[in-house]
Amino acid sequence: KVKATSVSDIKEICKAIKEANFPYKFIVLDTITALEEMVKPMALQMYINTPAGSKFTGKNILDAPMGAGYSKVREAMEAVIDLVSKCAPNVILVCHTKDSAVGDSDVNVKSIDLAGKTGRILSSKSDAIGFLYRDDDSNTVLSFNTNDKFVECGARPSHLRNKDVILGEMQ
């Protein structure tokens, strides 16, 4: 377990993994919410380096006019995730969830808790999305079932598609 508190930490970790000849099959980024905060300085610099952002004097990228900061945060997150994904064949992203309304209906679903469109875009690029919860028997379950409650869950690999995996049983 290695703790990173900045994008430069992540770059150093990736460099060390490359120098060690890629020893890991899996890398876990825990959490993506923390990564979203980490990339904000990078996103701010990316925005300032554009013609539209060259006169921006704010310190918070999300204060950029016309929502431009959100797309830069998304670009920065994608760049960091792409960097990490070159370090191992499998990257697991741990995300927090939020309750989201579906259109104008009274239906609420769980979705990835990231700003703007980032959660939806991240979902579309993922091979599998599971929702971790405790069932009625207090078992720890990772669900890849797409249903009316966990709409962003699902999996492209057939061995995970529409499956509930019990990770721990209550004794």
Please report, for each region that a protein language model flagged, where it lies by residue.
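Conserved GTP-binding G-domain of TRAFAC-class P-loop NTPases and closely related GTPase folds
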Residues: 83, 98-171
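Conserved, well-folded catalytic cores of nucleic-acid-processing
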Residues: 16-20, 38, 94, 125, ...
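P-loop NTPase motor core
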Residues: 32-121
